[in-house]
Swiss-Prot record:
Function per UniProt: Catalyzes the NADPH-dependent reduction of L-glutamate 5-phosphate into L-glutamate 5-semialdehyde and phosphate. The product spontaneously undergoes cyclization to form 1-pyrroline-5-carboxylate.
The protein's enzyme class: oxidoreductase
Pathway: Amino-acid biosynthesis; L-proline biosynthesis; L-glutamate 5-semialdehyde from L-glutamate: step 2/2
Cited Gene3D superfamilies: Aldehyde Dehydrogenase, Chain A, domain 1, Aldehyde Dehydrogenase, Chain A, domain 2
Taxonomic source organism: Leptospira borgpetersenii serovar Hardjo-bovis (strain JB197)
One Pfam family named in its UniProt record: Aldedh
EC number: 1.2.1.41
A GO MF term: NADP binding
Catalytic activity: L-glutamate 5-semialdehyde + phosphate + NADP(+) = L-glutamyl 5-phosphate + NADPH + H(+)
Cellular component terms (Gene Ontology): cytoplasm
Upper lineage: Bacteria, Pseudomonadati, Spirochaetota, Spirochaetia, Leptospirales
UniProt name for this protein: Gamma-glutamyl phosphate reductase
Cellular compartments annotated: Cytoplasm
Keywords of the record: Amino-acid biosynthesis, Cytoplasm, NADP, Oxidoreductase, Proline biosynthesis
GO BP term, pick one: L-proline biosynthetic process
Length: 416
């Protein structure tokens, strides 16, 4: 009973705040966000102290290295958070945008405009920057948000929401516009998923277990940020000068994120497979190899079939050798999570066949899978990267946090 009362109260307050946000001008919203960006830079020491507490707890609990990397904040990452907020400020406000306008033969005037979704709940793990990204995107698009982060990042998330609340209080705006769930017990999660009167959409960001639980139990529409089993295919006509830099960047730059490559597919006609595997090993990547690749690099480990559907989020990579593009496409269709697929090739027909045949949120030609990101796509930041097809696919930015309302003005017309 205690859980239900707590959840209903927080949800009700967020819904109430969402109504007041509709009346804020773009100027008012941008002013708040610019102050937030400045405050993030001014209060770095407080943020880092809170994050250090979470990191210490994480080490004591022996959290995986990939999760610890996502949990880590430093001065550079805080600067990146502030930069992302300013990018959001620079973007057009989607609220009020006219998407359709016409006068019907009977004289009725129709105008369709973008309006906020209402209340967005985001349930996420590890990454404190999500608190700022989601808070800023929701606020700019006129939505209240309910933030339920993981227990491992509790203190980091708490201080970031506190900074947001300081500015909202200063500007006379209801702080429930950015609602922080300060209960990390999972018993509080299920009641939130039943708050259909107050919450309009739930966005889960986290491990496969979290996504599955929310998808199965939510009575509220869910936009899934599912796992990223990203495939990168090296065609027989790939340019060797492009291959190693792209593959290394796709896997090594930040292995603990959803747009890092997990499966490397090698055409057996590509002549520099051995050199590529050696380059990956030199970067500290653990290679899980099929028999063909293992014969080129015996220091690797034999791959298991289930490895090809695993999101490692670590310096670990599964390798598959194929004899044709068609075989590569069949493999991708079987293993992909629908997140990101990429091809490296100089053959335009191969590139066209690749992009026309696959069904994922993003398909890349001759570039790193790491580019599948809201900021890189010019969205400022993202609520998540949706692997579903409704209501958004790919990075979920400002415009995707809106729906539409049609306003009809008449002069006494009735329908025959």
């Amino acid at each position: 009973m205690k859980e239900i009362e707590y959840v209903k109260e927080l949800s009700y307050r967020a819904k109430k705040a969402s109504r007041t946000l509709k009346s804020l001008s773009s100027f008012q919203k941008n002013k708040v966000l610019l102050e937030l960006a400045n405050l993030l830079e001014k209060r770095k020491s407080e943020i880092l102290s809170a994050n250090e507490f979470d990191l210490k707890n994480g080490k004591e609990k022996n959290l995986p290295s990939a999760l610890m990397d996502r949990l880590l904040l430093n001065e550079k990452r805080i600067d990146s958070m502030a930069f992302a907020v300013r990018e959001i400020v620079s973007l057009p406000d989607p609220v009020g945008e006219v998407t359709r306008g016409l006068t019907l033969p009977n004289g009725l005037e129709l105008v369709t405009k973008r309006v906020p979704l209402g209340v967005v709940m985001v349930i996420y793990e590890s990454r404190p920057n999500v608190t700022i990204d989601v808070g800023a995107l929701s606020f700019k698009s006129g939505n209240a948000c309910i933030l339920r982060g993981g227990s491992e990042a509790f203190h980091s998330n708490e201080i970031l929401v506190k900074l947001f609340h300081e500015i909202l209080n200063k500007e006379g705006i209801d702080t429930s516009a950015i609602t922080f769930v300060d209960k990390t017990d999972r018993s509080f999660m299920l009641p939130f998923l039943q708050q259909t009167p107050s919450i309009d959409v739930v966005v889960p960001r986290g491990g496969e277990g979290l996504i599955k639980f929310i998808s199965e139990h939510s009575m509220i529409p869910v936009v899934k940020h599912d796992k990223g089993v990203c495939n990168l295919y090296i065609d027989q006509d790939a340019d060797p000068a492009k291959v190693i830099p792209i593959v290394i960047n796709s896997k090594v730059q930040r292995p603990g994120v959803c747009n890092a490559t997990e499966n490397l597919i090698l055409h057996n006609g590509y002549p520099f497979r051995k050199e590529l595997l050696e380059a990956l090993a030199k970067e500290g990547v653990e290679l899980l190899l099929d028999p063909s690749a293992l014969s080129l690099y015996p220091k690797g480990r034999p791959v298991k079939e289930e490895d090809y559907q695993e999101e490692f989020l670590d310096l670990r990579l599964s390798v598959k050798t194929v004899s044709s593009l068609e075989e590569a496409l069949t493999f991708i269709e079987r293993t992909s999570s629908g997140h990101t697929e990429a091809i490296i090739t100089e053959d335009l027909n191969a590139a066209k066949m690749f992009t026309n045949s696959l069904d994922s949120a993003a398909l890349f030609v001759n570039c790193s899978t790491r580019f599948h990101d809201g900021a890189e796509f010019g969205l400022g930041a993202e609520v998540g990267i949706s692997t579903g097809k409704l209501h958004v696919r790919g990075p979920m930015g400002l415009v995707h946090l809106t729906t539409t309302t049609t306003y009809v003005t008449g002069n006494g017309q009735i329908r025959n």
